[in-house]
C-alpha cells in the first residue's frame, strides 16, 4: 500500500515536498504581490519549511536525483534527515525566476525616467518581499544551505542572496543598459542646472551595490561593489570626463580665467555633494581625481600664465582660489612656487631701486623698504597660500636674494652693505632720542629687525657693526632702554647661538662692574682727600670691546690728579692688571667764565684739552696747540674744525670760510669772546667725519681678518674628523659649516688651505689629485 506519509522504523514522519508546496507557493505568491499577511499565516509557511527540512528522507532523495553526494570537510559522505532541502531550494529558485521573467515584460520597453521609476519601485518591493521569504526559510538557511556552503558546493546561497542573484540574472542584466543610461542622462540634466528626482538615482545605486554578491562566500557580510563598479561607475566616470572636457574648453574660450576658477571650484563641490546625496562613497576619490584632471591639470599652463597676472594685480582672493585648485594636483604647485619667488625677488629689487641713492645713507628707509616687501608677501603666503611650507620657502629664497644683492649693495660695491645698514637702523632705534618709540612699539620693531636679520648672509658683518655701535651707546650712556638692549641681544643669541653674542653680553657685564667700581672709588675718596671735580670711569675688558688703543695725548694738568688717584686705587685692588686709557672715547663738561653768559660745554677730552689752553692765552698757533696737547696733527685739525664751526674759536680773519681754510702749523686760532648760544648747556662733542670713515674701513678690514681665521678653524675641524678629504668635498663642508655666519668665497678658502699647508696642519696626498690629509 503506497502513501506520501509513512512511519519509518524510528517513528519519525516522512513529509514529501508535494504535500506542502501548493500551500507554500500560494503563501510566497502572497508575499511577492505585497498582500497583507497575518502572523499566524506567516508561521504556517515557516512550519511547512521546518517540517519538510526535518522529515526523514533517504540521502539521494534529500539531495535530488542525479546529484552526486559532496564530501564533507572530514571526507565523509553524510546523509540523513537534517540535510533535506535541495528540492525545496530548486522550487524556490524556479518561483523567483518565473516571477521576475513575468515582471521583466512590464519594463523591457521603458526608457529614461520611466524605466528608472519601474526599476527602483520593483527593486524596493522585491527586496522587501525577499527578506520576508528569507525569514520563512530561516531553518533551510541555517541547516541545509549552511551545510552545502560549508561543503564547498557552488551556486548555493541563503534565500535572500538567491533572490538577489535571480534578480541580477533575470531582471538586472536585461535592463542594465537602459537603467544606467537613464541614470547618466538624469545626472547630466542636473549638471546642466535642471532639478531632478535624486531618489531614482540613489535607488538604482543602492540596487547595484547590493547586487555585488560575494560568489565565493554566500555568508560574507557586505557587497563586493563589482556590479556597481562595472555596470555604473566606469561609465559614469567616462561621462564625467566627456562632460567637463567640453564644458571647461568652451568656458575658457568665452570667460576670463578668474571666472573659470570659480566655476571649477563650484563644480568640484557639486561633484562632492553628488556622491554624498546619491552615489556610493567609494566613488568619491575616483570622481575627485577625474574632475581634477579635467578641470585643473589639463589647463595648468593657462593657470601658470594667469598666476603672474594675478600677482601683478595683487588679486589675493583669486590667488588663494588658484592655490586651492592647483594644490589638488600632485606636484602641481612647483611652477607656482618658482613664479612667486621670481616675482617677490623682482618686487624687492624694484622697491629698493626706487629709493635710489637715499637708501645708501638712510638705514631706516632701507630697512623699512625691505620690511614693506616682506610684510606684503608674507601676508599673501599666509592668507592665499595657507602658509604652505613650499611657498614660505619661496618667500625666504626671494627675500634672501634681493636683500643681499640689490641696487644699494651695487652702489656700495659690497654685499656687506645690507648687514651694515641693518645694524645702523638698530642703533637709531636703541639710541636715546626725542623720537624713541614706546617700549611695546620698540619691541615690535626689534622683532621686525630680526625678520630682516634672518635673511642676511653676512651675519658676521652685522655683528661687527652692531658691537661697535652698542659699545658707543654703553660708553656714552646713550641707550634708550637697558631692557631693549638686553632683549635685542637675547633675540640675536636665539638666532645665532651663545658664541655670536658672548662679547655683547660681556660688554653689559663690564658696564655693571664699572658702576660698582665707581661707587667703591667714591667711598674711597670720602675716606681720604676728595677730588675737586666730579670724576667717573668705565673699565672695559680689552678682549670684548671693539676699540683701538688711544693715540698720543698729554692729559691736561686739571685732570692729572684725578687720573693719578684712580690709577693708584685700581692698582691696589687689582695687582698685575694694566690700564690703557681710551682718551678718544672720554668726555667731560667745562663751565665757561669768559663770555657774557655762563655756559656748560659738553666736550670730548681732546676738545677739553684744547679749550683749557685758553685759560692762559687768547690765541695760539696750530703748532703750539699740537705741542701742548700732543694730539697728532691730522686729528687735531678735525677737532679744531668742530670748535671753529661752533664759533668758540675763530681764525685770525674772523670772516674766513672755515671749510675752505687749510690749517697750517702757523695758523693762528683765537678764543672768540663774543660767543653766544640760545642754550646754556651746549653739546659740542660731535663725531669727526674722517674718524667715522676710518672706523668703517677698520671694521671691514677686521671682518676679513676674522673670516680668514674662522675659515682656517673650520678646515682644521673638518680635516681632524675626516683625516683625508678631496678638495671639492672640503670646500662643500666649509661652506656648509660657515653659511650661518657668512658666505665664504672659494678663492679665500683656497688661500686658507695653502696657509694651513704652510703651517703643516695639512698636506697634499702624493699621487692623488686634489686630496688633502690631516697632520696630527
From Swiss-Prot:
An example Gene Ontology biological process: ubiquitin-dependent protein catabolic process
Provenance organism: Mus musculus (Mouse)
PANTHER family named in the record: CULLIN
Covalent cross-link (Glycyl lysine isopeptide (Lys-Gly) (interchain with G-Cter in NEDD8)), residues: 720
Stored SMART domains: CULLIN (SM00182), Cullin_Nedd8 (SM00884)
Residues with the Omega-N-methylarginine modification: 63
Swiss-Prot/TrEMBL domain comment: The Cullin neddylation domain restrains the RING domain of RBX1 in the E3 ubiquitin-protein ligase complex; this restraint is removed upon neddylation of the cullin.
Gene3D superfamilies: Cullin Repeats, Ring Box Chain A, domain 5, Winged helix-like DNA-binding domain superfamily/Winged helix DNA-binding domain
Name of this chain's protein: Cullin-1
Subunit (UniProt): Component of multiple Cul1-RING E3 ubiquitin-protein ligase complexes commonly known as SCF (SKP1-CUL1-F-box) complexes, consisting of CUL1, SKP1, RBX1 and a variable F-box domain-containing protein as substrate-specific subunit. Component of the SCF(FBXW11) complex containing FBXW11. Component of the SCF(SKP2) complex containing SKP2, in which it interacts directly with SKP1, SKP2 and RBX1. Component of the SCF(FBXW2) complex containing FBXW2. Component of the SCF(FBXO32) complex containing FBXO32. Component of the probable SCF(FBXO7) complex containing FBXO7.
Gene this chain is encoded by: Cul1
Pathway assigned to this chain's UniProt record: Protein modification; protein ubiquitination
Every Cullin neddylation domain range: 706-766
GO molecular function: ubiquitin ligase complex scaffold activity; ubiquitin protein ligase binding
Family classification: Belongs to the cullin family.
Tissue: Embryo fibroblasts and embryo preadipocytes.
GO cellular component, as recorded: cullin-RING ubiquitin ligase complex; Parkin-FBXW7-Cul1 ubiquitin ligase complex; plasma membrane; SCF ubiquitin ligase complex
Post-translation changes: Neddylated; which enhances the ubiquitination activity of SCF. Neddylation prevents binding of the inhibitor CAND1. Neddylation leads to structural rearrangment in the complex that allows interaction between the E2 ubiquitin-conjugating enzyme and the acceptor ubiquitin. Deneddylated via its interaction with the COP9 signalosome (CSN) complex. (Microbial infection) Deneddylated by murine cytomegalovirus M48 leading to a S-phase-like environment that is required for efficient replication of the viral genome.
Protein function: Core component of multiple cullin-RING-based SCF (SKP1-CUL1-F-box protein) E3 ubiquitin-protein ligase complexes, which mediate the ubiquitination of proteins involved in cell cycle progression, signal transduction and transcription. SCF complexes and ARIH1 collaborate in tandem to mediate ubiquitination of target proteins. In the SCF complex, serves as a rigid scaffold that organizes the SKP1-F-box protein and RBX1 subunits. May contribute to catalysis through positioning of the substrate and the ubiquitin-conjugating enzyme.
Origin superkingdom: Eukaryota
Keyword set, alphabetical order: Host-virus interaction, Isopeptide bond, Methylation, Ubl conjugation, Ubl conjugation pathway
Lineage: Eukaryota, Metazoa, Chordata, Craniata, Vertebrata
